[in-house]
Regions:
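Hydrophobic positions on the alpha1 helix immediately C-terminal to the Walker A/P-loop
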Residues: 3, 7
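Conserved substrate/cofactor phosphate-moiety recognition/catalytic segment
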Residues: 9-55, 60, 89
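A generic secondary-structure signal
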Residues: 10, 111-115, 162-166
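A generic structural motif
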Residues: 13-17, 74-76, 119
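Short glycine-/polar-rich loops that comprise or flank the Walker A/P-loop
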Residues: 15, 118-123, 168-170
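Anionic group-transfer/hydrolysis microenvironments
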Residues: 23-24, 82-83, 130
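A basic- and aromatic-enriched beta-loop-alpha substructure that forms the phosphate/nucleotide-
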Residues: 53-101, 125
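A glycine- and Lys/Arg-enriched "phosphate-lid" helix/loop adjacent to the NTP-binding pocket
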Residues: 87-159
């Protein structure tokens, strides 16, 4: 993201701050026999691939975060997207929409809860962006297989707002 890139440039000489981009490369490398990656599969059929995509997103994000914590024990770690966003925005939204089934959602929550203690989160930086702006950015970056309707981005925005408004102290 632009924000993470700019922060990384600002802290380039500070080895106490570590930056982690979204692990899209990992997602692109998981392919079926026809060469379609997980991002393509997810956006072409969310009902079928919502659970597997969310598990993969969480596992890959958690994996790079745990590695960063281990390799940089006294550093501030800034991630492009928080693992809590996986649970409280994307997985929750897909579950509410009936795209992740009840039993799969329970499995997801168990997996999430089992490992989340390994990576304590002390603060969130939330850059609120209008869905229309996000839509333009998605089109501009033109990532392979990423066809995201503006309605999906609007719902993501609403779920971010709901989750964060519940977690902001009065």
């Amino acid at each position: 993201s632009t924000l993470v890139d700019n922060l990384e440039k600002a802290f380039i000489d500070d080895n106490t701050v570590c930056f982690l981009q979204e692990p899209v490369e990992i997602w692109n490398n998981i392919k079926d026999k026809d060469g379609k990656n997980m991002i393509e599969k997810y956006y072409s059929n969310q009902e079928k691939y919502a659970f597997s995509f969310q598990m993969m997103a969480y596992i890959s994000r958690l994996s790079i975060l745990r590695k960063a914590v281990k390799e940089n024990p006294n550093s501030v770690i800034i991630t492009e997207r928080c693992v809590h966003t996986d649970r409280n925005v994307f997985a929750q939204m897909l579950y509410d929409d009936g795209k992740i089934m009840e039993t799969d959602y329970q499995i997801y929550l168990r997996w999430f809860d089992e490992f989340i203690e390994d990576v304590p989160i002390y603060a969130f930086i939330y850059l609120q962006t209008k869905p229309e702006v996000s839509f333009q950015r998605v089109q501009k970056r033109n990532r392979e297989g990423e066809v995201i309707p503006i309605e999906y981005l609007d719902r993501c925005n609403k779920y971010h707002d709901m989750w964060l408004s519940e977690n902001i102290p009065d």
